[in-house]
Amino acid sequence: PRVRSFIAHQSGITSVIRRSPDIAHRMVRSLSVSSQRNKSVAHHEDVYSHNLPPMDEKEMALYKLYRPERVTPKKRSAELLKEPRLNKGMGFSLYERQYLGLHGLLPPAFMTQEQQAYRVITKLREQPNDLARYIQLDGLQDRNEKLFYRVVCDHVKELMPIVYTPTVGLACQNFGYIYRKPKGLYITINDNSVSKIYQILSNWHEEDVRAIVVTDGERILGLGDLGAYGIGIPVGKLALYVALGGVQPKWCLPVLLDVGTNNMDLLNDPFYIGLRHKRVRGKDYDTLLDNFMKACTKKYGQKTLIQFEDFANPNAFRLLDKYQDKYTMFNDDIQGTASVIVAGLLTCTRVTKKLVSQEKYLFFGAGAASTGIAEMIVHQMQNEGISKEEACNRIYLMDIDGLVTKNRKEMNPRHVQFAKDMPETTSILEVIRAARPGALIGASTVRGAFNEEVIRAMAEINERPIIFALSNPTSKAECTAEEAYTFTNGAALYASGSPFPNFELNGHTYKPGQGNNAYIFPGVALGTILFQIRHVDNDLFLLAAKKVASCVTEDSLKVGRVYPQLKEIREISIQIAVEMAKYCYKNGTANLYPQPEDLEKYVRAQVYNTEYEELINATYDWPEQDMRHGFPVPVVRHDSMDG
C-alpha cells in the first residue's frame, strides 16, 4: 500500500504541475520530508532490536508483542529539550527539529549518538579527578538520559567506579557542595503518616514506579553516618539497575528517609542539607518505616520492588526479617553481598577441586554483610548434602571483640549458631592456626588487617588460599591485590570489594576480580520486576550466584579473575532474570500472566535500549474508500447564480 500510495502521489504531482506550480512544489517537498521520515523510522526499527539475534517472522512478531510501545511526546520546543528522557541534543534529525519545534534552538550541527558519546568520554578523561568526573556525568544524566546510559554501558569498567563505589562515597561526603538538581524523594521523620508519605510519593513525576531503593543514610558504604547526604547511594544504585540490568529509568525511584544524623561534623556543617538533630530511634523510627512501606504499596501496588540499602547493622537484619514475607523487598547489603561472594566461592571450587561444604571459612568482621554471607554459605552447604549444624561448624566469625565463642555473655542472636567452643582470642593468626580455614573473608573496614604474616599463614595451610578483602572503599580494604599475590607467590584466589589494578609477578599478569554486588542485584531486580515475583528469598539469590559463577571463563581463571568481566554484566543480568522466571513459574511464585511464550525474548524485549529512538510515530495508510467524503459535492454553475 505504501508503494501504491507513493506512485499515486507521483502521478498527482505530474498532473498538478501544469495547473499550479506552487502546489506541485509543496507536494514535492512533502514527499521529500516523508522519505526522510521513513528512513528514520526504518533506522529506528533496526536499533530497536539491536541486542537480539537474527529472528524469523514468528520470533519477530513475538518480540514486537513484548516490547514497550513508544508514543509521540506531547512536549514541544524548549520544554522538550528540558526533558532528559527525550532530549537528544544535536542528535535530533532535521525532520524532528522542524516537526517538534526545535529548529533554531539547537546549533546547526547534526551528530550521531556515537559522536556524542565520544565527545563525552573525551571530556571526562580530561577532568582532574574522579569527583569532577562524577559531577560531569551527573550533569549529563540531567540533560540527556539515553546518552548518559550509552556512555556508561560502553565504558562500564572505566565508569562504574565513578557512578558507584568508590567515587559515590566521596560524592556523598561532599553532597552539600556538589548538589545541583533533585534526583529522588526526601521523606523525613516529620512526615510520619501514611497519608503524608503518600502525598510526597505523589509529587514524583513518574506514576509507573516499579523499583524503589531506600536508605536512611546511617551506614553509607564504609563511611558511616552521612544522613541526608546518603541520597547519592539510591541514585547510584538505580543508575546501575538501568545500565547493568536494563531496568527502565521511568520505573526507578530513589528515596532518602531523613531521621536526623549522629554525625557531629555534618550537624555543624553550614552546607548540610538534612535535618539538624540527632537520629530518631525506637517506636517513632519503626512507625516511619511501617508507614513508608504501606504508602509505597498503596501508591504503586504490592508488586513494587523495595530495596533496602546501607541501613546500620542493628536495623538491617531486623527490617529484612520484618518485611521480607510481607512485601516485595530485599536488602542488597545482606542478600546481594552474600550472593556475589558465594558466586566467587563457587568459582574457586573449580580451582581448589573442593566443594563449598568441604572448606572452612574465617570471617574477619561480623556485621550484616559477613553474617549474611555466612548464612548463604550454610544454605549452599545444605544443598550439597550436609546438615545445618555441620555447615555452621565450618564457619568462624571474628568481630571487634575477637572470635565469637560460646563463652560470651552477650551475643548477636544470629551469631549463636556460629559460636565456637574455643578459647577467646583477638588474634587472626591464632584462629587461622587453630581452625585451618581454606578461605579468609574480610568485611571489617580495617585497612591492613590481613598483613604479611596473616597472608603467609593462609598460604602455609592451603595450596590455593582464598582471600577476599571486601571492605569499601579501597582505603579500607583488609589487604591489596598486590599484597595477596606477593605474599602467596601468586597462589591466592583473591577478590576485593572495590577495584584494584592489574598486578604483574614473576612474569605473570594477575587481574583481580571485584566481588561487586552489581553482578547480582541488577539481574535480581530485573527478574523480580518483569515477572512480578512477590517474595525475593535466598533461593533466588543462590540461583543468581550459580549463574554468575557459570559465566567465568577458563581464560579468566588463568589470570586470577574469579568473577566475569564487567562488560558482561548486562548479559548476565538478562540470564539471571530468565533463570528466575523459570524457577518462579515452576514454583508458582511468578505473578505475570499469561506466562510469556518465550521467557528470554520477553526479557530482551523489555530491557532499556540506550540507542536513540524516533520520537515521532510512523505514519500509515488507510484504505482509500475510507478516506472519501460521504456524499458528492453538487456542481453549481456560475451562470445560475446570476440575478
UniProtKB/Swiss-Prot annotation:
UniProt cofactor(s): Mg(2+); Mn(2+)
CDD domains assigned to the protein according to its UniProt record, in alphabetical order: NAD_bind_1_malic_enz
Regulation of activity: Subject to allosteric activation by fumarate.
GO molecular function terms noted in the UniProt entry: malate dehydrogenase (decarboxylating) (NAD+) activity; malate dehydrogenase (decarboxylating) (NADP+) activity; metal ion binding; NAD binding; oxaloacetate decarboxylase activity
Residue sites binding (S)-malate per the record: 219, 472, 516
Cellular compartments per GO CC: mitochondrial matrix
InterPro entries linked to this entry: Aminoacid_DH-like_N_sf, Malic_enzyme_CS, Malic_N_dom, Malic_N_dom_sf, Malic_NAD-bd, Malic_OxRdtase, NAD(P)-bd_dom_sf
Record localization: Mitochondrion matrix
Residues holding a divalent metal cation: 309-310, 333
Positions annotated to bind NAD(+): 219, 313, 333, 366, 369, 472
Effect of residue 237 to A: Reduces activity over 100000-fold
Role noted for this protein: NAD-dependent mitochondrial malic enzyme that catalyzes the oxidative decarboxylation of malate to pyruvate.
Family, per entry: Belongs to the malic enzymes family.
Protein name: NAD-dependent malic enzyme, mitochondrial
Origin species: Ascaris suum
